[in-house]
Amino acid sequence: MTLQEKYARVILESCLKVDKNQPLFVSYNIERSDFVRIVAKIAFEMGVKDIYFDCSDPYIKHEALLNLEVDELKGLTFWNKKMWDVYAEKDAAFLMLASETPGLMKDVDPEKLSAMTKYAQETRRGFDARRDKSELAWCIAAVPTTAWAEELFKESANPVEDLWNSIFDICSIDRKSVV
């Protein structure tokens, strides 16, 4: 078992405690589709039959924010988070894979970015309310992006691998017994 597989298993079994037949909702950055495939494989092996993938591409969001007005942006599906509420009603386990792209939005109008963040939150109020009442299983787990890794490991020949190794070390993934 690779360290990424072990990390995915720890997230699903120990952090989220996903039950057989429980729906799973995975929010992630498109750059980490490789890790999401590992998560899906393990989830299916655990008996999960319903997985919703909420994929985002920060570079496409960036271009949209630079070129469209707020009303036009609201028509784009990646800011409409209604499926979060749909899966909250199904008592899904929610896995948010956090992947940063440092500095990407620095040239975006802060008011526009704020408006779209607020809109996304408005479209997932059901999820937020149930999460805030601890009625849902949810977990935020870090996965590297190239830009994030290069920002942290400027001198490294393999910054993504180094960031993965840091995550594994922080989470004790490389130890025999993680939990």
Residue spans for each PLM region:
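Active-site bordering "gate/hinge" segments
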Residues: 1-179
